[in-house]
Amino acid sequence: MGKSLVIVESPAKAKTINKYLGSQYVVKSSIGHIRDLPTSGSSSSKEPAAKGRKSASEAPALSPKEKARRQLVSRMGVDPEHGWKAKYEILPGKEKVIDELRRLAKDADTVYLATDLDREGEAIAWHLREAIGGDESRYKRVVFNEITKKAIQEAFSQPGELDINRVNAQQARRFLDRVVGYMVSPLLWQKIARGLSAGRVQSVAVKLVVEREREIRAFVPEEYWEVHADLGTAKGANVRFEVTREKGEAFKPLNEAQAMAALEKLKASAYSVAKREDRPTSSRPSAPFITSTLQQAASNRLGFGVKKTMMMAQRLYEAGYITYMRTDSTNLSADAIGMVRGFIEDEFGQKYLPGKANVYSSKEGAQEAHEAIRPSDVNLKPTQLSGMERDAERLYDLIWRQFVACQMTPAEYLSTSVSVTAGDFELRAKGRILKFDGYTRVLPQQSKPGEDDVLPEMKEGENLKLIKLDPSQHFTKPPARYSEASLVKELEKRGIGRPSTYAAIISTIQERGYVTTHNRRFYAEKMGDIVTDRLNESFANLMDYGFTAGMEEHLDDVAQGERDWKHLLDEFYGDFKKKLEVAEVSEKGMRANQPTLTNIPCRECGRPMMIRTASTGVFLGCSGYSLPPKERCKATVNLIPGDEIAADDEGESESRVLRGKHRCPICSTAMDAYLLDEKHKLHICGNNPDCPGYEIEEGQYRIKGYEGPSLECDKCGSEMQLKTGRFGKFFGCTNPTCKNTRKLLKNGEAAPPKMDAIRMPELKCEKVDDIYVLRDGASGMFLAASQFPKNRETRAPLVSEIIPHKAELDPKYHYLCDAPQKDPDGRPAVIRFSRKTKEQYVQSEVDGKPTGWRAFYDGGKWKVEDKR
């Protein structure tokens, strides 16, 4: 009897599983996905010659439309008009992995597909079976919610079959996303700007951020005042009260005058306790984590982004420390409940254990077969993890505490409310005393300011002494900006996306440049605004929240075998294609990205400038750009944002920023400010380009973010000015013939000058007809094609390649010429850059992968480290 082959996605998971299976199993990793639809540039638009096909002279010529359709299908890898025929390709670099798996599978009696238990894991398992091939009856599917000895042995004792319905649900999602992305994005390039993209779920998520941005822009903060009074008791205790009512009505002065008038009356009033109420209250623990609540808690308590949270959770799961981290169910297994109840009783005592297990309801549609996210072994404390980085330990600590707390008794408080009268005014103070800590012994709560104040003894009718009155100005706050965590919460609430897709959605909308983050809050970029509008107009259902959520439910139906996946795709595509054809029409189709004409004269030709928006931001472009070539003017003016970013989202800084903005004279929306130069600021309506409103303000302006003197160009000696580009602020030379730039570092200083590019004619490019030049970048030295950006080939240099050019090198790189040129086996030393230490080192490589031999420059000497 031969051995059985077990295939999982990751080496870490393989290593953990291998501990629990006997020697009759061979556990191998596919290292993630092995097949996919064509990636950019991987699929040729040329059709292979077929046996018996007519020659080119005999074959009927394809119409331009049909030729374009075939090229699109070739790029997409899926044909929506011919039964959704798909062309999957082995991913680059995975050929050796597949060859090894085929070889091992050939000698195996059984092939166990032990990929993750969600739809994506099911799809990976199917792709593995399809790519490896052979008798399908040899393949078995095993799933487990946690990588423990018991769970693994149970899964392998009862293997199942691949669930093709779940595979088809994943394929349907992939095909939908591919069709929308590949067919709408070119339309955006044509109508709005190059380099834009659309996505079935991505664009809807951007719409949420854009709509919130518009709510904020339209919001007009209103002033109001609060008055607090510090009062003293007969026993000398001081208590802070808030003035809440005047003559029975809510007290809310609208300006300083009203607040000061109230202060005069309060100064002349006598203060007496009208009522004291003490009542018991309690606080129940919340449910164990699901994917979305884990992401929110990790953001709020640990400051983790969604992507980092899922990365750390993945490592914990693969090491066997937690259950599967992509779940929407709060369900806990009977074994898990028994384990944690025993732990609570042993660790904290009977009074912390409720009479029966706490049960939490999941949202409708949650997969109850899955469990909530919890520790695999509650007895394993966070400090006892082995081989985990600090951030993974912190996340485990959060998961462990939430799990234990969710099965503990409530925290009990004595809440106190005291009302005081002062003439026509009523004042109120609240506080509470913790009587029994309950679940908070494990999971301390984040209290609101003043919530846990302890009020001293005060009896009804007791007179209090006025110590101080404290008036404070406030402004009403606009809707809060989304953070990564709150956007995930909103997506979940609206039924958009699933636990396995939240992190990808959040990452994608940032990578596409439609939104940016400042102080961990999302801001919609102008291009995100424009694209959202155009997609809303041309693809109303695609951008509709209900439609997107409905599609998720339909995909759930496919996974349950209750709906045919190709019928679902056909229904979507029929309507989508009609809308796309209408949008593509030149006149009545999708609105183009029209510029706004201004009265600002072009510095080169005198024609009026226009406000334009590109994928890189807002700028001024000469109206003469559209003229015939001989008369054309290509002058542009970079616009530097002149607005402050709100310092935080919890306070009133957003309101104060809004109050400082100009309001559009046409539509009253808050305007965005940009610096034209040191004497002119341009205010552009937040609804531009739909609203043409703008204003020019004169004054003396200084660019925020730089407090030092102007710089002298290290190349030509001219002045360098601070500018803002797609990737942030930088210094650019004012000499039009000099293209020198230097980044602005976070500390407000200019980055060190870059080394001039060094031509290396002896080094020929590998993929294009060009030679290499040695360049100096943010990640140290690298080789790049001399005709960049036409040719984009780059690679790391060898030590032996830079030595002949030592005289041309910047002295700061001379030490690299003294590095070892080869490892002990004669492999050449490659110069690499460490993002962690921000320093260059050398290492030997085989097929682009480190051999284990490397050398570091430390203390003026090269030190070799050999881990081969």
From Swiss-Prot:
- Cellular component annotations (GO), alphabetically ordered: chromosome
According to its UniProt record, the EC number is 5.6.2.1
Can you tell me which family this protein belongs to? Answer: Belongs to the type IA topoisomerase family.
Q: At the top level of its lineage, which domain of life is listed? A: Bacteria
The entry's protein name is DNA topoisomerase 1
Note the CDD domains from the entry.
TOP1Ac, TOPRIM_TopoIA_TopoI
What's this protein's function?
Releases the supercoiling and torsional tension of DNA, which is introduced during the DNA replication and transcription, by transiently cleaving and rejoining one strand of the DNA duplex. Introduces a single-strand break via transesterification at a target site in duplex DNA. The scissile phosphodiester is attacked by the catalytic tyrosine of the enzyme, resulting in the formation of a DNA-(5'-phosphotyrosyl)-enzyme intermediate and the expulsion of a 3'-OH DNA strand. The free DNA strand then undergoes passage around the unbroken strand, thus removing DNA supercoils.
The Toprim domain covers 3-147
Q: Where is the active site?
A: 324 (o-(5'-phospho-dna)-tyrosine intermediate)
Region Interaction with DNA, residue ranges: 197-202
Phylogenetic classification of the source organism: Bacteria, Pseudomonadati, Pseudomonadota, Gammaproteobacteria, Pseudomonadales
Give every Topo IA-type catalytic domain span: 163-580
Subunit structure, per the record?
A: Monomer.
Q: Where are the zinc fingers (C4-type)?
A: 602-633, 664-691, 713-738
Q: Which UniProt keywords apply?
A: DNA-binding, Isomerase, Magnesium, Metal-binding, Repeat, Topoisomerase, Zinc, Zinc-finger
Binding-site list for Mg(2+)? 9, 116
Name the gene for this chain. topA
